[in-house]
Structure formats: structure tokens, C-alpha cells
Amino acid sequence: MSKGKPPSRPATQIVEGGRRSEWTHLGGGKGGIVNPPVWRASTILYDDVAALRAGVRTNEDGKLFYGRRGTPTQWSLADALTEMEPEAAGTMLYPSGVAATAVALLSVLNPGDELLMVDSTYDPTRGICEGLLKRFGIATRYY
């Protein structure tokens, strides 16, 4: 959604969300495509090792970084979802529910904290609690 435009109705936001001209317009009056294309990428090539390390260090939106987190497909979807929530600061997308669970837990827990977790939790979530969180000094108590 371009800045300065009045807010669109939700149905319009769903259809138009996430469009950036750098992904959809050819420029020079040549037109373009309606929606950003799907970028399929598992590996991103860099000119040299220094550029790779800089990419890993900064991991900026808008810069190709890694196939599951760093292509216009992900950025376009994140932009569209953010536009649907006017008060949102942004949107983070994760390649799996396990990754999303780990980040959600790590975003609110600190070393020395104790997490109360239902005993019937999804097994990979238990693995996060028993492995990753434990290594960070976060205890888990099951109930």
C-alpha cells in the first residue's frame, strides 16, 4: 500500500497487499506484473566470503540472504500481513511452526526464568524446552 493513500477496505488490502514496485513494475513505461513472483531459492550466491559474512551479520529486509528467510516472496507476504494490522510494527515469517515457537519463547524468556508447559505439549516443543531453553538457563516445569 503506498504511503499517503487512504486506508483500503480489507478485501482490497488482501488483494493488493505486499506489492512493491521494484518487484512488479518493469519501469520506463513498460508496465509490469500484478503480483510479485514466487522466488524459489534454497541457496543465495555471494561474490565472495566477505559478502556472505556481511549478509549473515546484517540479515536486512530487502536484501537476499537465505532461501527460507530473505526473498521478495517472504517480504511481500510480510508486508501484506502488516498492512492488514494497522497497529503492527511489522511481521516476522518463519519456515516452520517449531521455528516460530522457539522465537516466541526466546522473545519473552530470560536466563533464570521458569516456563510452565503443559505435559502433553507437541514433542518438538518439548525438545526446544529440554534443549535450547535449557542451554540458555531457562527451566521448564511441566504440569
Q: Which residues does each PLM region occupy?
A:
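N-terminal glycine-rich, Lys/His-bearing helix-loop that initiates the first secondary-structure elements
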Residues: 1-61
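Conserved N-terminal alpha-helix of the aminotransferase class I/II PLP-enzyme fold
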Residues: 48-99, 124-131
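Glycine- and other small-residue-rich loops at beta-strand/loop junctions that grip anionic moieties
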Residues: 66, 93, 118-119, 140-143
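Glycine-rich helix-loop-beta junction characteristic of Rossmann-like nucleotide cofactor-binding loops
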Residues: 83-85, 106-109
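Conserved PLP-anchoring active-site segment centered on the Schiff-base-forming lysine
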Residues: 107-125
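PLP-dependent aminotransferase-class I/II
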Residues: 127-143
